[in-house]
């Protein structure tokens, strides 16, 4: 007998919220029953149907405060609360609230969804604040979930790099590693030159290659504590709206060849990391991996070993892949 789908209340209909919405249309295990955003109904109606990256979703519309999609069973009430405690999660019998506004990232703030009646909260970003929130990367450490009411789905880059690091460390041992994520620009950057707390991010996102920071290396060592002190990294924001790639250069304990490394990834992709880590030998570029549901997809052609140093390139749709893991984690923490 099939179990009931996980009932999700979605707070935030921005980039991740809209990707979660679209990903949910392909899932029998998770259903979105309510969506909250400060946008009015007409804006939600528009963004549900039209997207510059994902294209048009025909049949998506908001009528009388309900979002539906023709040809599907999707039906979610639309709300416009600024206070999460006022959301009708109790009335909607919400199992997991997805906190996807980017605003309520501390444990205390995210817990307002519990006050509103949700059983669990999953934050769609790395957590903030002094009170710790466990970061779960599906396929890597999700089995360490221990009943916490509030957890984080980490970041898209952490979801990209940790499956790769897990395979390399378990198979060959990692002595040290440096990662560089060549990352699509995001809404935190400027369309035109303008003020920003990080000087280089003051420059126009679609006109510049912008070196900046990433918390992915530190987060990776929280997810894989055996790598503490062994990893560091940075980001380079580039003029594409979506589709990213991480370069991971590691000093491995074992002597390896490119074939050894690629075989390990192929085995993982067909085994314990199936659906999370993918591999490709095709001549793909960033636009080719848009809509890819994997957390990460290793570019096997680019694997290189020189004098004991190993370089991996791994692709990821930094919006849609991450959003699919939100669904996976939600299902896991409600089992």
Swiss-Prot record:
Enzyme class at the top of the EC tree: oxidoreductase
Gene Ontology CC: cytoplasm
Disulphide bond pairs: none
Keywords: Cytoplasm, Glycolysis, NAD, NADP, Oxidoreductase
Assembly and interaction partners: Homotetramer.
Keyword check for Mitochondrion: no
UniProt-recorded Gene Ontology molecular function terms: glyceraldehyde-3-phosphate dehydrogenase (NAD+) (phosphorylating) activity; glyceraldehyde-3-phosphate dehydrogenase (NADP+) (phosphorylating) activity; NAD binding; NADP binding
Protein origin, superkingdom: Archaea
Single biological process term from Gene Ontology: glucose metabolic process
Name listed for the protein in its UniProt record: Glyceraldehyde-3-phosphate dehydrogenase
Family matches, as InterPro entries: GlycerAld/Erythrose_P_DH (IPR020831), GlycerAld_3-P_DH_AS (IPR020830), GlycerAld_3-P_DH_cat (IPR020829), GlycerAld_3-P_DH_NAD(P)-bd (IPR020828), Glyceraldehyde-3-P_DH_1 (IPR006424), NAD(P)-bd_dom_sf (IPR036291)
Reaction equations catalysed: D-glyceraldehyde 3-phosphate + phosphate + NADP(+) = (2R)-3-phospho-glyceroyl phosphate + NADPH + H(+); D-glyceraldehyde 3-phosphate + phosphate + NAD(+) = (2R)-3-phospho-glyceroyl phosphate + NADH + H(+)
EC number: 1.2.1.59
Annotated binding of NAD(+), by residue: 15-16, 37, 301, 318
Subcellular location: Cytoplasm
NCBIfam families, sorted: GAPDH-I (TIGR01534)
Family: Belongs to the glyceraldehyde-3-phosphate dehydrogenase family.
Pathway field: Carbohydrate degradation; glycolysis; pyruvate from D-glyceraldehyde 3-phosphate: step 1/5
PANTHER family associated with the record: GLYCERALDEHYDE-3-PHOSPHATE DEHYDROGENASE 2
Source species of the chain: Haloarcula vallismortis
Residues that, per the record, bind D-glyceraldehyde 3-phosphate: 155-157, 186, 201, 214-215, 237
Catalytic site positions: 156 (nucleophile)
């Amino acid at each position: 007998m099939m179990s009931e789908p996980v009932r999700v209340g979605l707070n935030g209909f921005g980039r991740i919220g809209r990707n979660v919405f679209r990903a949910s249309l392909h899932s029998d295990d998770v259903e979105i029953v309510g969506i909250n955003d400060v946008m009015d109904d007409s804006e939600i109606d528009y963004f549900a149907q039209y997207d510059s990256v994902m294209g048009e979703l025909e049949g998506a519309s908001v009528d009388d405060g309900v979002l539906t999609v023709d040809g599907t069973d999707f039906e979610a009430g639309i709300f416009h609360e600024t206070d999460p405690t006022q959301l009708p999660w109790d009335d909607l019998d919400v199992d997991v609230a997805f906190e996807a506004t980017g605003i309520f990232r501390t444990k205390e703030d995210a817990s307002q969804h519990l006050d509103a009646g949700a059983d669990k909260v999953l934050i769609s970003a790395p957590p903030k604040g002094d009170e710790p929130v466990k970061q779960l990367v599906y396929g890597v450490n999700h089995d360490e979930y221990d009943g916490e009411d509030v957890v984080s789905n980490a970041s898209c880059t952490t979801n990209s790099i940790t499956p790769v690091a897990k395979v390399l460390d378990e198979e060959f041992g990692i002595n040290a590693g440096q990662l560089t994520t060549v990352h699509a620009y995001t809404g935190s950057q400027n369309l035109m030159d303008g003020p920003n707390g990080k000087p280089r991010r003051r420059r126009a996102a679609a006109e510049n290659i912008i070196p900046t920071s990433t918390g992915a290396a530190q987060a990776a060592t929280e997810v894989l504590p055996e790598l503490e002190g062994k990893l560091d990294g940075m980001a380079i924001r580039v003029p594409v709206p979506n589709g990213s790639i991480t370069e991971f250069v590691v000093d491995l304990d074992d002597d390896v060849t490119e074939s050894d490394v690629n075989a390990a990834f192929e085995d993982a992709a067909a085994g314990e990391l199936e659906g999370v880590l993918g591999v490709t030998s095709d001549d793909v570029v960033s636009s080719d991996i848009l809509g890819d549901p994997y957390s990460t997809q290793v570019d096997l052609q680019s694997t290189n070993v020189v004098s004991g140093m190993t370089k991996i390139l791994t692709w990821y749709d930094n919006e849609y892949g991450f959003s699919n893991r939100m669904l996976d984690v939600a299902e896991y923490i409600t089992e």
